[in-house]
Amino acid sequence: MPSPSVTQECYPYQNEPTWSKSEKVIARTAFDVALGRELHDVIQKAKQLANEIQQSSDLWDLEHYLTERRKEIDRKYDYRYSQLTHVFGRLLHEGRVSEEELRGLREDKLKPIRSFAKFLAEDTAA
């Protein structure tokens, strides 16, 4: 029977899929592109809000918007491999990443990504 340390080096978590080098490249690229798209949207909205500032309360509304979006983005974009299938599932559901951009990932990753996106779609529809 192998020692626990040997088993942990091969499979850190029993149910966690392993990511090949090529999958890591695909995942990092898709992750960065999706994050860039979301940050672009935040920048556009912030510019719009800044242009509409008429009084001091509008300034604090902009600050509140930016703070909330930063918190949301920090929670959403978690690049731990143990979290990536959920991250990509959510991004797929939101339209921030496409299945085409995930092409090259093995089915053991694509299946839970699609499943989570479908779950979120059904949950939103309910």
Q: Residues of each region from the PLM?
A:
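Acidic, Ser/Pro/Thr-rich low-complexity regulatory regions
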Residues: 2-126
